[in-house]
Regions:
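Beta-strand/loop substructures that line and gate deep hydrophobic ligand-binding cavities in soluble
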Residues: 82-134
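Hydrophobic ligand-binding cavity/cleft-lining segments
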Residues: 1-44, 48
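Alpha-helical coiled-coil heptad-repeat segments used for dimerization/assembly
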Residues: 22, 134, 138-141
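Glycine-rich portal/gate segments that line the openings of hydrophobic small-molecule binding cavities
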Residues: 38-85, 105, 138-157
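Short, surface-exposed coil-to-beta transition loops
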Residues: 3-5, 63-67, 90-93
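Generic structural detector for well-ordered beta-strands
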Residues: 5-11, 56, 69, 96-98, ...
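A short, structured loop/turn motif at beta-sheet edges
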Residues: 14-15, 72-76, 96-105
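Beta-strand elements of well-folded, non-transmembrane domains
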Residues: 10-12, 59-61, 72, 87, ...
């Protein structure tokens, strides 16, 4: 049961960072190298409590679908997306946001179990955990770049 923890500091208001983190459109941009598309549920705009999104993407040369649901929501402090169906045995991804001086700090906690028992544990050790960490880091770097520029206006309503 690996747990990935990340912390990212962003020079932008907490409300903006929170909303960018739940933007389906920004997520699509951050995962474009995996040809990730929102194919069902909320497919654009901002996702909210009890809403789902189904993503279609290619990871490890396999095209796959994953459906997640927002299972906790406290704007602008926290939201959780949890897997409903997909390649993992389960996952919960908690996103925490707090103001620290002039910065907003995102704290991600990605808690998951791979399928296939011991084989899944070996895959985690060899490549899955590092792949997931890299994806989350890339996504947060994009959120940071967009939140700290005027680009955020493309993703959030005025």
């Amino acid at each position: 049961m690996p747990i990935i923890k990340l912390e990212t500091k962003i020079n932008a208001p907490v409300e903006r960072v929170f909303d960018l983190a739940r933007s389906i459109d920004l997520h699509k941009d951050s995962m474009s190298k995996y040809d990730e598309k929102a194919v069902a549920g909320v497919t654009s705009g901002l996702i909210n409590m009890d809403e789902t999104v189904t993503w279609e993407a290619t990871h490890f040369y396999v095209r796959q679908n994953l459906t997640s649901k927002i299972t906790a929501f406290d704007r602008p402090h926290h939201f959780r997306d949890s897997m409903v169906s997909g390649a993992f045995a389960r996952f919960d991804h908690d996103h925490y946001f707090e103001r620290s001086g002039a910065e907003t700090v995102i704290k991600d906690i990605f808690d998951y179990d791979s399928p296939l028992g011991i084989l899944g544990n070996i895959a985690d050790f060899l490549f899955v955990e590092s792949h997931l960490r890299e994806m989350l880091e890339e996504r947060n770097e994009l959120i940071k770049r967009i939140a700290e520029s005027d680009e955020w206006r493309k993703f959030l309503p005025s």
